Each structure stands twice: as structure tokens, then as C-alpha cells.
Amino acid sequence: MKAKEIREMGADEIRRKIDDSTQEMFNLRFQHATGQLENTARLNKTKKEVARLKTILKEVEQ
């Protein structure tokens, strides 16, 4: 998800997306630990997406 798309969302929607992405990251880490995750790059992409969402949420709240 691009930063421009995130900025068009409302603060509540961004928070919901953060929760969803955090849950997905937890599941991906669990799959990675058990050896079931084939695409490990997805874990890093999700981590960066959460960071991007949190950064833009702080910008919106100011």
C-alpha cells in the first residue's frame, strides 16, 4: 500500500489497518518459526507496512 493511499484514509481506518497488519505479522512469524512460510519477504513487507501506517497516523493526528 502506497503512502498516498494511506493518507486518503481516515484515522480510524488506519488504526484498523494497523491492527490487521499486526495480526498478519504475528501469523507470518509463527509460520516462519514452524517452517511453513515459503515467501519470507512477505514478513518484511508487512513489517514495513505497519511502520508506514504508524508514521502516517502520527502525521494525521497532529
Swiss-Prot record:
Keyword tRNA processing appears in the UniProt entry: no
Q: What keywords were assigned to this record?
A: Ribonucleoprotein, Ribosomal protein
MF terms in GO: structural constituent of ribosome
Q: Which CDD domains match?
A: Ribosomal_L29_HIP (cd00427)
Q: Which GO terms describe its biological process?
A: translation
The cellular component terms of Gene Ontology attached to this UniProt record, alphabetical and capped at eight, are: cytosolic large ribosomal subunit
Q: Does the keyword Glycosyltransferase apply?
A: no
Give the Gene3D superfamilies listed for this entry.
Answer: 1.10.287.310
- Could you tell me which PANTHER family the record lists for this protein? 60S RIBOSOMAL PROTEIN L35/50S RIBOSOMAL PROTEIN L29, LARGE RIBOSOMAL SUBUNIT PROTEIN UL29C
The name under which this protein is listed is: Large ribosomal subunit protein uL29
